[in-house]
Amino acid sequence: MKRLLLIAVVALSGCSTIMEQIPSRWDANQSIIVTDMQQMTRHIDCTADLKPQLHDLFTKVEWYDIYATTKGTHDMAKLDQVMLTTIKEFQDRASAGPISPMYCDMKKKILIQQADIIAQTVQGRF
């Protein structure tokens, strides 16, 4: 009986590690939100007030994170953490005072790149 229990424990723990390696399936809701994220990053206007723009973008990315985590697609949830950090740093800098156009443009390009990577990963699933 102890052998059977040991075999069952090993088999079940092996299955759980295999399941972590299998990518999650395509999801229409995630595809919509990542397209919104791409669009929002492309439309950041460095000449306008950045706080509301960054707040809206942060809210979208946070929605994606909550949805992916709640749904259990942890492979997709890991993707947004870097983008959330970038947005938070950008928000903190915008709150501290005026931002140079070059800094804003560089952060915008980074956010566009991060949104594109997330979108390609999310929409490239089947």
Pin down the residues of each PLM region.
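Post-signal-peptide N-terminal segment of Sec-exported extracytoplasmic proteins
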Residues: 33-66, 121
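Short, low-complexity, Pro/Ser/Thr/Gly-rich segments in the mature regions of secreted, periplasmic
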Residues: 107-126
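Long, amphipathic, charge-rich alpha-helical segments that form helical bundles/coiled-coils
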Residues: 60-105
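Bacterial Sec signal peptide processing site at the extreme N-terminus
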Residues: 11-32
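Non-transmembrane, amphipathic alpha-helical segments
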Residues: 22-29, 46-53, 75, 96-103, ...
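Sec-dependent signal peptide recognition
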Residues: 1-7
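Residue-level signal for mature regions of secreted extracellular proteins and peptides
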Residues: 8-9, 39, 97
